[in-house]
């Protein structure tokens, strides 16, 4: 696996852990789901925080680049989990965000 593929997979796993960690409390608070879902939510958010420490860049650069990946993964979640069709504006926004992420993440290293 190339370094770029490893970093992309790490970004995607980080985003998924954050989304699950936030979605489960949303289900409890908005959809009346059982409170025990807060336990896996907390574990997922702890996993999210730990995964952030595995990224090779400085924290601020990691967070900035991660934002683009988060947007793309959140839109995939919207389509797959929530069953909402993506608009062309959703796709355009994700492409722009991923472009910004690529500029940050793929910059020449000094």
Swiss-Prot record:
Lineage: Bacteria, Pseudomonadati, Pseudomonadota, Betaproteobacteria, Burkholderiales
Coiled-coil region: none
Transmembrane segments: 9-29, 34-54, 66-86, 88-108
Predominant cellular place of this UniProt entry's protein: membrane
Membrane topology: Multi-pass membrane protein
Keyword Cell membrane: yes
Pfam families given in the database record: UPF0060
Keywords assigned by UniProt, alphabetized: Cell inner membrane, Cell membrane, Membrane, Transmembrane, Transmembrane helix
Organism the protein comes from: Burkholderia cenocepacia (strain HI2424)
Extent of the signal sequence: none
InterPro entries linked: UPF0060 (IPR003844)
Location of this chain's protein in the cell: Cell inner membrane
Assigned protein family: Belongs to the UPF0060 family.
Cross-referenced HAMAP family: UPF0060
Assigned GO CC terms: plasma membrane
The name this protein goes by in its record: UPF0060 membrane protein Bcen2424_1283
